[in-house]
Design a protein with these regions (language model features):
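Auxiliary Fe-S-binding modules of radical SAM enzymes
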Residues: 1-15, 176-264
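Short, well-ordered coil loops that connect the C-terminus of an alpha-helix to the N-terminus
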Residues: 31, 35, 151, 199-200, ...
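Short glycine-enriched, charge-decorated loop/helix-capping segments at active-site entrances
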Residues: 40-44, 146-152, 220-228
Length: 264
């Protein structure tokens, strides 16, 4: 029985996959994104331990919300932090879910793809029980990506290609930060990359916000994006046009923020 370190749980998520989702935020992330709104999930020191079996049992209590007439089928989404750090735990959890025909989604930045702590055999096993990957594509330029996140983007792009080649459905997300991730050149480069992938069924551009700033301050971490504004509606429309999102497409505009509730 595998145990995982869980930061918090959300029983009625509406933005992390199709339908109503039971969202599990895991503890631990190797990236240090300058606009991160969940910096308290970076280390493995917080959170609480759960077995995959007890966590699935907890999530399955909400199954009646997952199959509402006239709505997309919901299910379970595992987010972070970076869930690939706990791939064995997620694999066991998703295996239990698939035994009950529950839709599974993995919200990941893909930063450790190909690394020793994520064996390829283990990743492939995880993908066998994952229906949808929510891939956070942060920045196309390698140098800017390293400055923005502290890590290289080559593994992320490689993982996206692997997912495409192996027929795994992806929703791709990109946070639009004025002056950092919104240049015309880079958004066009992103569009070209996305056009090369065969299994991307949705692209979401999310406006940068400062909802997590208080968390940085509480943790004593300098907030390096102080003074950076939230993009305007017009700037978001321009970015969407460059990436190729059809006009009139409506997305939520924000990612989930863990509440700290573990429901235990």
């Amino acid at each position: 029985m595998t145990r995982g370190k869980v930061h918090s749980l959300e029983s009625f998520g509406l933005v992390d996959g199709p339908g109503v989702r039971y969202v599990i935020f895991l503890q631990g992330c190797p990236m240090r994104c300058q606009y991160c709104h969940n910096p308290e999930t970076w280390t493995t020191e917080g959170g609480s331990w759960w077995s995959a079996e007890e966590l699935f049992r907890q999530a399955y209590r909400y199954k009646n919300y997952w199959k509402k007439k006239g709505q997309a089928h919901g299910g379970i989404t595992v987010s972070g932090g970076e869930p690939l750090l706990q791939w064995e735990f997620v694999t066991e959890l998703f295996t239990l879910a698939k035994e009950k025909k529950v839709h599974t989604a993995l919200d990941t930045a893909g930063s450790i793809f190909g690394a020793s702590r994520l064996p390829m055999e283990g990743f492939e096993r995880l993908m066998e029980v994952t229906d949808l990957i929510l891939l956070d594509l942060k920045e196309m330029n390698p140098q800017k990506h390293k400055k923005l996140t502290g890590m290289e983007n080559a593994p992320i792009l490689e993982m996206a290609r692997w997912l495409s080649d192996h027929g795994k459905e992806m929703w791709v997300r990109h946070v639009v930060v004025p002056g950092l991730t919104d240049s015309r050149e880079e958004l066009l480069e992103m569009k070209a990359f996305l056009d090369s992938l065969k299994t991307v069924t949705r692209v979401e551009l999310l406006p940068y916000h400062t909802m997590g700033r208080a968390k940085w301050e509480n943790l004593g971490i300098p907030y390096v994006l102080d003074g950076v504004p939230t993009p305007t509606e017009e700037e978001m429309k321009e970015a969407e046009a460059l990436v190729g999102i059809p006009l009139g497409t409506v997305f939520s505009g924000f990612l989930s923020v863990p509440s700290g509730n573990t429901e235990k």
